[in-house]
Amino acid sequence: HTGHTKVRGNKEYWPNSGWVYYGNNREYKVAGQEPYDPNHIILPEIMKDNGYTTGMFGKWAGGYEGSVSTPDKRGIDRYYGYICQFQAHLYYPNFLNSYDRAAGDTEVKRVVMENNINYAMFGDDYKNRKDYSADLIHQEAMKWLDKQTGEQPFFGIFTYTLPHAELAQPNDSILQAYQGAFCQEKTYGGDAGSYYNHTNIAHQQFAAMVTRLDAYVGEVLEKLKEK
């Protein structure tokens, strides 16, 4: 950081927004961080003004929900991911955020994770959650790339969240490939306040998260070659 650009910081805008429930899980009605000043021009706005169709997939963290600085107001045509940087630490959330200008959306909305909300965010019940955000975000990014025909230039920002604070992912072949790969595993006891759940295979989880991200990147590059 050179000192010549805006730093978002992590000032939160949650405490006075009230509550909303998803299943038995309580969330703030408004989530997110301090918004960018609208006079501070950001890259997607420049690209949009120059004729590009724009997409962003992953973490936003450039302004809380409903603020002056959300993807729909800052040059993004298609967005899917986390508006809030804190929530982006977690991989089986109660909701994600979405905006699709082409579909007629007028603002960023919440998309409820129906396969998650009937289970607690912390504890053994958490293992029953099925909607894994990293996979969903990548899937939406690939759908967006598929729609690019070459008639209009496109600009994508892929702010994927792997790996991050929470060590959690599907128990699939990617995770299983690292079983027993480390001479000494590490146990993480969890943090109820942050909803980071316990794991006995911290090294295995982290390594698999990096591999999962690498697979995503490979798929993106292959799709770009097609285009």
Residue ranges, per PLM feature:
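N-terminal cofactor/phosphate-binding cores enriched in small/glycine residues
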Residues: 1-3
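Conserved amphipathic alpha-helical interaction elements at protein-protein interfaces in regulatory
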Residues: 6, 147, 223-226
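Formylglycine-dependent
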Residues: 8-52, 60-154, 159-169, 193-207
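Short alpha-helical functional segments enriched in proximate histidine and acidic residues
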Residues: 50, 54, 144, 216-223
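Metal-dependent active-site segment of extracytoplasmic phospho-/sulfohydrolases and closely related
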Residues: 154, 159-160, 212-227
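Extended hydrophobic/aromatic segments used for targeting, binding, or gating
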Residues: 173-216
